[in-house]
Amino acid sequence: MKYDFSFLSVSAFGEAAEYACELFSEEIELRAGYRPFENGEPCIELVCDDSIADKDSFVIEQDGSHLIIKAQGIRGLIYGYSYFLRKCVFSSNKITLIKNISGNYSPDKKIRGHQCGYRSTPNTYDAWGPEEYFRFYRDIMAFGCNICEHIPSGGKDENNPLMKYHPLEVAVWASELADKLDMDVSCWYPNDDKEDEESALASRRKVFEAMPRIDAIFPPGGDPGEMDGDDFIKRCIKISDTLKSIKPDAQMWPSAQAPHSNITWPEDFLSEMNKLPEEIDGIITGPNHAFMMDDLRRKLPSKYPIRFYPDITHNVRCEYPVHFDRDDWHYAFASTLSRESVNPRPTEFRLLHRLTRPYVVGSVSYSEGASDDVNKAVWSDMDYFPDVSLYETLCDYARFFLWQADASNIADGILGLEKNWEGDPAENPHIEHTLRIFEAELEKAPSLMENWRFVLLLFRARCDVLVYRRRRFELELIDEAKNFASRGDFALARAELMTDYDADYYVLRASLGQLADILFEQIGIQLDVENYHAAGWERGATLDTIDLPVTDRAWLINRFEASDAMPEGEREAFLTRVFNRNKINSGEYYFSLAEHGFGVLGERQRGEFYIDYQGDRREVNNGSIPMCMLKAFDNYTFVCKLAGFEPDTDYKLRVTFKKTKNDMFNTFYIKANGKDIYRGKFYGGEKDEQFEREMLQERFTCAVYDLPASVFENGCIALEIGEEHVGVVLSEFKIYKA
C-alpha cells in the first residue's frame, strides 16, 4: 500500500528534534520545492525518546499518513527521517511513501563510516569546504553511518591549487560540523619513524587540543610507516595516554598493516599485543595487512575488537581489485579507466561484506572522493541492515539522491555499470544498453544534469561505450591487417591500421570533457591533471588514461615505424615475426595473463598474489608494448598444469619477466613435473636476444630454458616458477619445440 505525504506538516518534540526538523525540512524543500507546514495532515512527528535502546537506533510508528519517528537524539532522528525519504517517490509537488515503514530499527555493526580526509591526493575532498563536508555527512548518515574519518596532518603532501585550507584547519571545523549531527570523528594519523617520541607526542597534543571532537585515532602500522611492530605499539600506547588526557572518551585503534620491508613485523606486533595493553581499544585491518583477517582474529587477544578498513575506491594495484575473487578485469578497461575511476561495484562489495562480517565490529572505508559514492551507500547499508536486498539498497540510493529519475531504472543502470566490466568489452553488447538507460532517464528529466551523482554515472557509462566501440573497431582493423600481412602485402596492412574513427566516436569522446567540466563545478571531482588539478594520472584522472591503447593496433603501427629503416627483405621478415609474435604450432603452448587469465592454467595460484598492472601507465602503454604483456603476475610462486605436448619431443620454455631481479639471492627456480629445470640466480637460462630486442619493452626481459622430453608425462607438464625471498614477476610464457 502507498501513502500520500504531499504538503506534509512536521512537528518536533525535544531540542534535538527541533534541529532534526530543520534539517528534514531542508531535505523536503530540495526534493518537493516547498517546506513542510507546521500543522495539518499528513503529519510527521520527530520525537526525542530516552527509552530508545541507544543513539544508533530509531523507531517508526505509522498510522496511514501519520508518522512518528522516535530516537534518543539527533543521530537517530536523522536515520529515521532519512529512511522515510529513502522510501518516498517525489513527482512535482507530490510525495508518495511506497510502503508502511513501521518498525524498530537497530544497526548490526557498531562502527559504520567512511574516510574523507582533506589532503592533496584525493580526487574530490581537496576541493571541498564546510558546506560540502556538511552535506556529505548528512548524505552518508542517510545510509546509517555514525563516523567520519579525517586526516589532520598533511604529512609530506603539499597543498594543491584547489586547497583553500590547511588540513588541521579542516579537521577542526569538520569535527565541529560532525558534532552538530552527533557523528563520531576518527583521525587517520600515521607515525613517522624518523620522528622522536617527544616530538610525536607534542605535535599530536596540539591536534588533539585543537579538534572539538575526537572519538578515535587510527595510526597505520604501515602504508605509510616503517616502525618495527613492537615499537609501533609502544608508540601508540604513549599517544593513547596523551589522547585520553585531553579527550577521555576517545579510543586508540592502531592498524595491523605491515611495512613491506619488515618480515618480522607481525610477530613483533603480536608480542606487544599479547601483553594486553589497556591503552589500546581495538585493532584495524586493511591494505597491506600483516595477517589474513581470520588469522588476525585467531591470534589477536579476544579483548580487542577488529575494525575493517575496506578499500572501496581502487580498481587495480590494490587489496580488492575489480573481480578480486578471480582478478580478471579486462585490460581494455583497466588501462583506460585505471585505478580510481567511477566504480560502482555493488555485488562485489556485497560479497566482500559477507566474507568479512563475522570477524569485525564495523568498518570505516578507505575512500579518495566521490568516485566510489555508490559503494559507500551499499557498504553502509549492509553495516546497518546486513540482510538487505542489494536491489532495494540501490533503489533507496536512487530515491534519496536521484529523486527526479525512476528508481528501478537507476538501480538497473548501476548494476549494468558493474556488468559492463565483465569479460572482453568487445564481446559485451550490454555496454550500449547500460548507456541507453541513463540517456533515457536524462531525456525524461533534463534536470538530472544538475545532479552530480547522475552526471557521474552518465560519465562512466559513456566511458565504457567509448572503450567498447574503440576496441571493436580496432580489432576489425587488426583482423584485416593480418589478412594483408599473411599475403605479404604489408603496405595495405599498414594502411588498414591507420584508418580513423568515425565522427560519432569523436562526438562521444568530446562529451566526456563536457561532463568533466560539469562535475568539476558541481562536486570538485578532478578528472584530469591539467584542467582540474588531479594529483596524478592514477588519482581518478580518467581523461588522462581514456585514450590509451586497448588493442595491439598502436604496437603494430610502432613496429611498422621501426621497420622503416630496414632493408626490404629484412623488413618483411621482421614484420612477419611481429604479426606471428604469439603464434604456436600444433603441440605447443602460449600463455599471457592479460590475454588468457588464470582460468586456463589448470591450477589455483598459491597465497596472496599481486598483479602489477602496466596498462594504465602512459610511459608503458604508449605503442611500445603489446597487450599480452600488460599484466605482470607478482608472487613467490607461479604454477600451472598443461597438456597436449607431443611424445619424445624436446621443448623450450621462454618466459617474459619484468626487470625486477635481485642478484642478492640464488634461490630462483623452475620445476617441471617436480624436476629442477633451473635453480640459481635470476633469471638464468639463455637469452633470446632477437625476441627481446624486437618484441619486448625495455621494462621486460626474457629467458629460455630446456624442457627435455624426459620431463613430460604422457604429454602433460606441471610447471612451477618461484623464488622464496622476493618472488617472481612474469607476464607471459611460451613452450615450443626445440
Annotate each language-model stretch with its function.
Residues 2-6, 10-31, 51-199, 209-213, ...:
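Feature activates predominantly on carbohydrate-active enzymes
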Residues 9-15, 46-50, 70-72, 118, ...:
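Structural motif
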Residues 34-56:
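Short, well-ordered secondary-structure micro-motifs within conserved domains or adaptor modules
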Residues 67-71, 97, 452-463, 630, ...:
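Generic recognition of long tandem-repeat/solenoid scaffolds
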Residues 89-93, 146, 157-175, 179-406, ...:
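Catalytic-core regions of glycoside hydrolase
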Residues 113, 216, 282, 644, ...:
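Extracellular/lumenal ectodomain signal focusing on beta-strand-rich modules
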Residues 367-375, 386-585:
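C-terminal non-catalytic alpha-helical accessory regions
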Residues 564-738:
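Extracytoplasmic
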